């Protein structure tokens, strides 16, 4: 039986939030962010670093590059949209919902030794929710947290390790 499962929303009311803040999961998220902060303390920007980037970090970089390069394929509509441009929805559906499954699966098909295709089920929603909400066409801190959760999952799976944290933070 797989230990991976599709994430679901669990915070609807204030009591849910209070329960989450007291949970092990919340502590793990905060600890992961602290580890990243400590990993970059006193270090130069990764763009200028002479250290080599690990294969897993290079794979994540390629995933992000693929995601952002696809923006060119979906230029904004020339309309007066008060709440965001609807071409974002098309980009989100094609690049994140459809293509991201294949792209995230590629993370585990490299020579990194971690070949867990079942993890895609859990990782995919965190990744595509990192880039905003296609229904509301919005972006906020919850979406940023989704990217942290995507990275945290990779870290807990041991796809990423402590040496990768400084690159994540810069």
Question: What name fits each language-model region?
Answer:
Residues 1-129, 134-148, 168-170:
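N-terminal leader regions that mediate targeting or early regulatory function
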Residues 150-161:
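Well-ordered alpha-helical scaffold segments within catalytic/enzyme domains
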Residues 160-170:
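Alpha-helical bundle/repeat cores within regulatory domains of eukaryotic proteins
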